[in-house]
């Protein structure tokens, strides 16, 4: 998170959402990135080069605060689908049905959009970076990564975005907010696809998963992670070692460990405040284990629905709000929203402050246990995952 005070630029790591937009928009190259051991980046400011123009501050998504009034009012009226690729092989190999990649490819092929900014696979850590695709540069399924459960600075390559009539932006809510700040002169119309997100992960989360598998992430970061694929909910792999994702997610995601610090100041998991037309998420609790996979799609706008209907490679099964409500995590999103002021240091109800303090204490304790002890039997991790969630108990 960047602030400009009396022409002096300052950076707060604990509120940084790791999008990389500040690095990309700086006209004087006064901002550089320094990789940390946990896979995140520190933002370094060269005061001698900084001209205090404020572009980085205006683009920073962490500086955008919302009240979230009425956020949940329209969910009962929205359209919902379980979506998946028509080809079962592709469906199985994707994170959860292959909807996101297929949206990008089909929308470019059928002319629904002229350009799309998303991610591409790379050979070195973090194994993904931002990429601009066009109707002349349509990616294959293998060009784009499956879900990546360590932080990727998705907005560092925005200079690749060329002017076009209709632009698709794909990313989490914070990434969409960052991209919104720079697209004014890039296109006539924008279609936004939000990847539902309550928490991004540091590389320490992957280190823990590797430990569970009986391997490790090498210090030089020359390894190959694959976080999803092979049906629903899929398999996590690190250099040939593997673990069912349902087990792998219990500690990092279930207990919110190794979370990017700036995630605490974002309660817009669906990207609605960023203007999302559709949101893609995993169908937890409403879909059982299967060999193929599907994505839960929440439609926010008619434009988003039209985009979906034009994707000939997708199968879309309509669902009612009552059918999908358990998977939407609305209660958990509410918890993020009410605790956001406490994470920002703003005045709020004492109960919310108490919940954040309890959450931090529990996270520190659990991290100490699982990081300091040697590899434990799976049953021990499952037991830890079932410990009462102190934050949620306070925020019943």
Regions found by a protein language model. Give the residues of each.
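Iron-sulfur cluster-binding cysteine motifs and their immediate structural context
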Residues: 2, 15-17, 21-42, 55-74, ...
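Flanking helices and flexible, charged tails adjoining ferredoxin-like Fe-S electron-transfer domains
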Residues: 1-6, 49-163, 326-344, 352-358
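Short, intrinsically disordered, charge-biased short linear motifs at domain edges
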Residues: 2-6, 10-13, 44-48, 246-254
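Long, compositionally biased charged/polar accessory segments in the mid-to-C-terminal portions
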Residues: 113-114, 213-396
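Generic beta-sheet signal
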Residues: 165-171, 190
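Short, flexible loop segments at boundaries between secondary-structure elements
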Residues: 191-212, 326
């Amino acid at each position: 998170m960047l602030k400009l005070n009396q022409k002096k630029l300052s950076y707060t790591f604990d509120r940084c959402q790791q999008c990389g937009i500040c690095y990309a928009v700086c006209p004087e190259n006064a901002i550089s990135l320094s990789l940390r051991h946990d896979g995140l980046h520190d933002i370094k400011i060269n005061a001698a080069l900084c001209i205090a123009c404020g572009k980085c501050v205006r683009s920073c998504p962490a500086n955008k605060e919302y009240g979230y009034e009425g956020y949940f009012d329209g969910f009962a009226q929205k359209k919902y689908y379980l979506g998946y690729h028509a080809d079962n092989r592709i469906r199985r190999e994707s994170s959860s049905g292959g909807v996101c990649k297929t949206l990008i490819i089909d929308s470019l092929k059928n002319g629904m959009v002229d350009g799309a900014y998303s991610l591409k696979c790379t050979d070195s850590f973090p194994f993904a970076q931002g990429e601009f695709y066009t109707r002349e540069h349509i990616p294959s399924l293998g060009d784009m990564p499956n879900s990546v459960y360590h932080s990727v600075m998705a907005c560092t390559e925005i200079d690749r975005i060329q002017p076009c009539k209709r632009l698709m932006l794909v990313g989490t809510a914070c990434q969409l907010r960052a991209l919104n700040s720079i697209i004014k002169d890039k296109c006539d119309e924008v279609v936004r696809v939000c990847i539902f997100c309550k928490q991004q992960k540091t590389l320490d989360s992957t280190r823990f998963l590797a430990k569970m598998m009986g391997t490790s992430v090498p210090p030089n970061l020359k390894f190959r992670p694959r976080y999803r694929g092979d049906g629903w909910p899929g398999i996590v792999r690190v250099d040939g070692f593997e673990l069912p994702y349902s087990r792998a997610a219990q500690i990092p995601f279930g207990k919110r460990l190794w979370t990017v610090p700036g995630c605490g100041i974002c309660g817009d998991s669906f990207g609605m405040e960023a203007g999302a037309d559709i949101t893609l998420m995993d169908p937890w609790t409403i879909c059982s284990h299967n060999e193929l996979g599907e994505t839960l799609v929440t439609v926010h706008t008619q434009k988003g629905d039209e985009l979906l209907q034009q994707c000939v490679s997708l199968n879309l099964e309509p669902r009612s709000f009552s059918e999908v409500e358990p998977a939407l995590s609305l209660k958990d999103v509410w918890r993020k929203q009410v605790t956001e002021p406490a994470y920002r240091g703003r005045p709020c109800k004492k109960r919310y402050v108490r919940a954040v303090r309890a959450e931090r204490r529990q996270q520190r304790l659990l991290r100490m246990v699982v990081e300091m002890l040697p590899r434990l039997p799976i049953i021990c991790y499952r037991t830890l995952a079932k410990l009462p969630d102190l934050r949620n108990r306070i925020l019943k």
